[in-house]
Amino acid sequence: MENRKTFSWLKEQMIRSISVSIMIYVITRTSISNAYPIFAQQGYENPREATGRIVCANCHLANKPVDIEVPQAVLPDTVFEAVLRIPYDMQLKQVLANGKKGGLNVGAVLILPEGFELAPPDRISPELKEKIGNLSFQSYRPNKKNILVIGPVPGKKYSEIVFPILSPDPATKKDVHFLKYPIYVGGNRGRGQIYPDGSKSNNTVYNATSTGIVKKILRKEKGGYEISIVDASDGRQVIDIIPPGPELLFSEGESIKLDQPLTSNPNVGGFGQGDAEIVLQDPLRVQGLLFFFASVILAQVFLVLKKKQFEKVQLYEMNF
């Protein structure tokens, strides 16, 4: 009898352990599915393809604008701001992974020239820290400090993201030169439509996989639909699964064609990319330019003085 009780207790503990493990896995998987910069980091060695396209566009299919603002020129070993703006209507709600509606998150990738990197905390001024807020930036790869990623973060609070950047010093980094450099940026608002494995998220349109009649629509207990489509020609039945989130456009008994949308498009977000240019300025050139301007001003002053002196001489000769 005691053996049975012991066995029953062990069985109960095993079931609990398995349940807890499954819950941890689901929670972890959900958080990863929302952390879209991770997809690019895991799947691509470089976030910018040879064509110039940033890989985030592979999952975020809608095209939306972004704006990048950087100084025209910076001096070596100087901290400056790179400001990314991701505009969108703050009243919009997106479909979450569970099918409910919620606010949009934003994320970004900033591709700097070689040698430029995230400014260390001790080099960031209090004013700049206030602009950054509670954002936490990370390098795309340990060996790619010039590529920074951020997100997902709440869009209502961080539709404008300020990156603190440290410019390189050619005196200590021999592979860096005083030149004009390009900066590339990509930013998205909202969840993607496709996962890296090619599967669809619930934030996109679902199309019919067969032509026929919608025979039955079964609403699932946890949300979503199971749609039975019967081919009128041969009676073959196809079942399309719709996850929670998208709204159905068809009712039972209606005809439908292959690839015709079964649902509305719930996506309200999108991805955009842009670029800018920045000059790593040589301080000696700046000093030379200032010296040139000063010499021009002095020359003008001496010219005016000489002219007045000449006029006085002419006036004296006329009076004489």
Swiss-Prot record:
Gene: petA
Binding site for heme: 36, 56, 59-60
PROSITE patterns: CYTF
Role description: Component of the cytochrome b6-f complex, which mediates electron transfer between photosystem II (PSII) and photosystem I (PSI), cyclic electron flow around PSI, and state transitions.
Keyword set, alphabetical order: Chloroplast, Electron transport, Heme, Iron, Membrane, Metal-binding, Photosynthesis, Plastid, Signal, Thylakoid, Transmembrane, Transmembrane helix, Transport
Quaternary context: The 4 large subunits of the cytochrome b6-f complex are cytochrome b6, subunit IV (17 kDa polypeptide, petD), cytochrome f and the Rieske protein, while the 4 small subunits are PetG, PetL, PetM and PetN. The complex functions as a dimer.
A cellular component annotation (GO) from this entry: chloroplast thylakoid membrane
Originating organism: Zea mays (Maize)
Family assignment from sequence similarity: Belongs to the cytochrome f family.
Cofactor: heme
Residues spanning the signal sequence: 1-35
Compartment(s) where it occurs, according to its Swiss-Prot or TrEMBL record: Plastid, Chloroplast thylakoid membrane
Protein name, UniProt field: Cytochrome f
Membrane topology, record value: Single-pass membrane protein
The keyword Nucleotide-binding belongs to this UniProt entry's keyword annotation: no
Transmembrane segments: 286-305
GO biological process entries: photosynthesis
Pfam families: Apocytochr_F_C, Apocytochr_F_N
Molecular function per GO: electron transfer activity; heme binding; iron ion binding
